[in-house]
């Protein structure tokens, strides 16, 4: 299994039997460029939270390309998804999509969204973990240690004169580089910070 990051913070998982898009956030054109490879549309899109930087234009993309959207009930309730084929999961939950050849597991994470989670995707050969947002601790990270690859998008470095209230809020829902380095110091797989 391979992956590609993109300019708007999403990830495309490239599986043997098809691709999975993780999160929107870009313009429709940006999402099409990032998620449609050689004319092949993704077999599904996973949206990890309702925040604009993750959910922007997912409805338009999924409707235009007839791509099912996988998310949680609480996240879906926050989005305008009329007409979109939505597959609802709860946190924590694991679901095997036999026909498409992949399984997904959702694990709760500390973040300021309706039902935050990180996910692992297994294609029967490899397992990849993605933490788009949220603060993780060693007790949660253990669920990622069985993954061949882990992609961390929950890294934060506060620069300059951020107001103290903003800095505290961000530090409560994101990890620093140092925290993540410590948490994953004994991880044997491939680790990517995006």
Language-model segments: which ranges?
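Short, acidic/turn-prone active-site loops that include or flank metal/cofactor-
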Residues: 26-27, 74-76, 91-96, 134-136, ...
């Amino acid at each position: 299994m391979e992956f590609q990051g993109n300019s708007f913070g999403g990830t495309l998982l490239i599986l043997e039997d098809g691709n999975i898009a993780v999160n929107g956030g870009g313009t429709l054109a940006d999402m099409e460029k990032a998620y449609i490879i050689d004319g092949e549309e993704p077999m599904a899109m996973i949206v990890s939270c309702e925040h604009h930087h993750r959910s922007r234009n997912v409805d338009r993309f999924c409707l235009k390309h007839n791509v099912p959207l996988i998310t949680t009930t609480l996240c879906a309730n926050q989005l305008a998804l009329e007409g979109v084929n939505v597959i609802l999961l709860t946190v924590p939950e694991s679901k095997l999509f036999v026909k498409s050849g992949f399984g997904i597991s959702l694990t709760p994470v500390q973040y300021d969204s309706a039902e935050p989670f990180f996910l692992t995707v297994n294609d029967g050969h490899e397992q990849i973990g993605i933490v788009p947002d949220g603060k993780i601790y060693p007790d949660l990270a253990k669920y990622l240690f069985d993954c061949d690859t882990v992609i961390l998008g929950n890294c934060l470095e506060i620069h300059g004169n951020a107001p103290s209230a903003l800095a505290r809020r961000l530090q409560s829902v994101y990890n620093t580089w140092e925290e993540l380095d410590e948490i994953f110091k004994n991880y044997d797989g491939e680790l990517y910070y995006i």
